[in-house]
């Protein structure tokens, strides 16, 4: 799970005109002075045409402006919003202005094994929670994300066992992981769109920036030992694409307002993940 801050340091109008058609001509067998003449019909049509009022189209009639990435599917919208939350130094699409002290660039990258273990332990708490929520599927859409191949809980358990065998003491989960896990449980009960935002950002960030961090930690602290946390069974790019397809399928059932609500949760996802990531430097 990589935060926007720390990861970077490692690197028309429709006008409806009435159709004016003359009344049907009278049946020849019943010609009468009461039927209008051709001249009268022409005058009637002219008066009708002069009375046509052109009014602006309603909002529903006007073509809706598409959101960035919308034409490619909702996942592309999510990616676009996530990239905007980076600074210009972190990504070319970045628009975020640094306003908080914790958002400032890390001037000293000095990870420790103890700090990294805290990060792994708290990460496992979050992945355990995600996988249980998806497995229980209190909301029907969650079932779509069972057994995606992106699950990390079992891999983290193996890594923590390896550290234990090397003589390290495994710490207890701390507040960043415990609080985030509780937040995810609460969201999953009443706010599926917001929960799925976190699901997407956690798994996809780990597959990108998370791997960069893992490689750097392995080189600096673990004698290039590759952890299971950064390994997947099968082609990772295909696993990610399968989940993208599922996310797009689920989002097709949402209203535009629900989609926007999901996107608005992105910044909170970055905040929670960033707190766990900073444990590496503790």
Curated annotation (Swiss-Prot):
Catalytic reaction list: heme b + 3 reduced [NADPH--hemoprotein reductase] + 3 O2 = biliverdin IXalpha + CO + Fe(2+) + 3 oxidized [NADPH--hemoprotein reductase] + 3 H2O + H(+)
Residues reported to bind heme b: 86
Gene name for this UniProt entry: HO1
Alphabetized InterPro entries for the sequence: Haem_Oase, Haem_Oase-like, Haem_Oase-like_multi-hlx, Haem_Oase_decyc_pln
Group of enzyme by EC: oxidoreductase
Protein's name in the database: Heme oxygenase 1, chloroplastic
Predominant place of localization: plastid
One Gene Ontology cellular component annotation held by this UniProt entry: chloroplast
GO term, biological process aspect, one: response to absence of light
Induction conditions: Accumulates in developing root nodules upon inoculation with the symbiotic Mesorhizobium loti strain MAFF303099.
Transit peptide (first-last residue): 1-56
Oxidoreductase found in the keyword field: yes
Pfam families in the record: Heme_oxygenase (PF01126)
Function, as annotated: Key enzyme in the synthesis of the chromophore of the phytochrome family of plant photoreceptors. Catalyzes the opening of the heme ring to form the open-chain tetrapyrrole biliverdin IX with the release of iron and carbon monoxide (CO). Produces specifically the biliverdin IX-alpha isomer. Can form complex with heme, is ferredoxin-dependent and its activity is increased in the presence of ascorbate. May affect the plastid-to-nucleus signaling pathway by perturbing tetrapyrrole synthesis.
Phenotype when the gene is knocked out: Reduced symbiotic nitrogen fixation (SNF) in root nodules associated with an increased superoxide production, and development of brown, rather than green, nodules during senescence due to the accumulation of hemes and melanin-like pigments instead of biliverdin (BV) in the periphery of the nitrogen-fixing zone.
Family note: Belongs to the heme oxygenase family.
